[in-house]
Amino acid sequence: DFKRIRYPVHVILTALSMFYLGKNSFRNIALILRTVMNVLVSHTTISNWCTNFAPMFQNMALQLIPALNFNSDEWHADETVVKIQGKKYYLWLILDSETRFVLGFHLDRHRDSPQAFTILEAVKDLGSPRAIVSDRYFAYQMPVKTLHGVQHIRVESFHDDITNNLIECFNKQFKAWYKTKQGFSSFSSANNLISMFIF
């Protein structure tokens, strides 16, 4: 709720933009705000903004979903690694080929079929693609067949006509942003910050 915040909304949005679109730490953002905008705000406060406003912006993004058409040619599935308190977690993602919208994500300690089932189950009511594209990792085979009943295209980046480059490019953008964060402090914080970046 912006009403309880003592800083102007444009300052908060500027800080959020620098964090999610740039490669700035909370301390750097505080320094930039002080130098450029003459606004004194602590790095801790900026961190709290990023964590607390993530659910609000995610809800706003979710409200847009019914107006979008995800019955596209392909949905792309992939997973990438993040660290939470130094421990390895897998970020599972589904991306629509036409809108470039991330349909959903799932954060888990494991990388196996149950996690693929979880993410594909979460997005199955959003539309009906003609095919779901993934790499050749076996975990997607049964969930795609069972939950969606569409063609499953398993690709190797350099050998197939259809590639998974779309979601791999997204993962590169995510990794560039994530690298500046040096991992996440908690599972809850990771979910909030990732959802803010995605949505």
Description of each model-found segment:
Residues 40, 48-70:
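Short, basic alpha-helical nucleic acid-contact segments in DNA-binding proteins
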Residues 4, 34-47:
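Short, basic interhelical loop/turn and adjoining N-cap
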Residues 128-141:
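Acidic/histidine-rich, metal-coordinating catalytic segments
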Residues 1-21, 41:
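Basic, short loop/linker segments at the boundary and entry of helix-turn-helix/winged-helix-like folds
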Residues 20-23, 85-109, 120, 170:
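Short conserved beta-strand segments at catalytic cores or DNA/RNA-binding microdomains
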Residues 68-84, 93-95:
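Two-metal-ion RNase H-like nuclease active-site motif
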Residues 5-6, 52, 105-126:
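Active-site beta-loop-alpha junctions of metal-dependent nucleic acid enzymes
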Residues 167-199:
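Charged alpha-helix within mobile-element recombinases
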